[in-house]
């Protein structure tokens, strides 16, 4: 067996969450599991709970979108203008390449791009962003700002590793605007789920980091 196991089953995330919820539910009931993660959103309609009974996954739905879509929108709207987006002749896709740290081909494209012909101050800022760890630090700043704006009305993030005097400011309204595209897709999916269900579920089980965001709830 693999690593000492004779048999291994892989479960999709909402099915795994349904099994977890099933283990803690004494009475039999229907539930809708909504798993809003970083890169994907998954929904499962299940019958769970009850002593000695097995959970039943009736149907599942999904989106190839999640929290990273909000990160990208926030980065493009508030971080990348400091690197020349919208105010230079640099093609837009270079800023997307820099922002998407989860996409290694895009990261390679950004790091091999020459910016010697870009006007100041963007040339120096982009070259600093290309240094080891630059795009990762920027992404962590974007993600941190998203989390802070979920709890507070305003946020400021210093970009001292790019320029000692450089910083980004954003408001809760800016975060709501950055989430609009993702929330639109999520709303459409939820309507599809609602139309497909024979009756309203007895409970709703939220899981995944993005499910805790107030603008998602």
Where are these regions (language model features)?
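Short, glycine/acidic-enriched loop or turn micro-motifs at the edges of active sites
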Residues: 16, 38-39
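Short glycine-/polar-rich loops that comprise or flank the Walker A/P-loop
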Residues: 29, 41, 70
């Amino acid at each position: 067996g693999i690593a000492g196991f004779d048999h291994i089953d892989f479960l999709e995330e909402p099915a795994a969450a349904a099994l977890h919820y099933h283990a803690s539910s004494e009475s039999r009931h229907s539930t809708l599991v909504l798993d809003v993660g970083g890169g994907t959103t998954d929904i499962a309609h299940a019958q769970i709970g009850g002593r000695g009974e097995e959970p039943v996954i009736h149907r599942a739905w999904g989106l190839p979108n999640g929290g990273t879509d909000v990160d990208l929108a926030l980065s493009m709207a508030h971080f990348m203008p400091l690197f020349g987006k919208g105010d230079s002749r640099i093609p837009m896709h270079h800023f997307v390449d820099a922002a998407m740290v989860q996409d290694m081909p895009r990261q390679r494209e950004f790091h091999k791009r020459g910016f010697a012909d870009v006007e100041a101050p963007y040339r120096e800022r982009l070259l600093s962003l290309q240094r080891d760890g630059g795009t990762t630090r920027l992404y962590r700043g974007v993600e941190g700002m998203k989390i802070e704006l979920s709890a507070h009305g305003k946020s400021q993030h210093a970009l001292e590793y790019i320029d000692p005097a450089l910083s980004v400011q954003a408001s809760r309204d800016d975060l709501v605007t950055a989430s609009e595209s993702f929330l639109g897709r999520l709303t459409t999916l939820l309507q599809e789920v609602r139309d497909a269900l024979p009756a309203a579920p007895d409970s709703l089980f939220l899981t995944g980091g993005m499910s805790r965001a107030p603008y998602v709830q």
